[in-house]
Amino acid sequence: MQITSAMKMVSAAKLRRAQDAITQMRPYAVKLQGMLANVSASLEQGEGQYSEVRDVKRVLIVAITSNRGLCGAFNNNVVKLATSAVKACEEANQAYAVLPLGKKALDAANRLEWPVAEGFGDASTTLFENLDFAHASEVANEVMAQFADGTYDRVVLAYNQFKNAAVQIP
């Protein structure tokens, strides 16, 4: 009984630390989002390489999940979102590839036999083992490079937005 109580206390402390980190980061994310919106609004349609309008022939679907389970619908919501994006591509006769980031997304891609995007190394399984800005930047830069060089005409992100410990918005 005491071991279970101690484990609950440790888990609660870890959860609180993670929540505090996310809460402290939220103002920066909001400010960054505002800055990006201003830059995007100031560009004329089709002016930048990332705002170019093109016929969508090939889509990259980036599915971001955790590496572990036991987190309720957290991973399932992302897989459902990615599945609906895959179905939309199939209905529109668009080629697609899935970039699974996180072990659960990779498992789903293998189980559902989705074509996995190439050129990202082992990011599917290693990104969240040692998550830092440099590693995440490498993946983001490769996604942007493949969009810029025309490998993909559209990029769809499937992820959860943190609201609180019990609720994540897909």
Regions found by a protein language model. Give the residues of each.
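Conserved loop-to-helix interface motifs that mediate assembly, gating, or partner/ligand docking
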Residues: 1-170
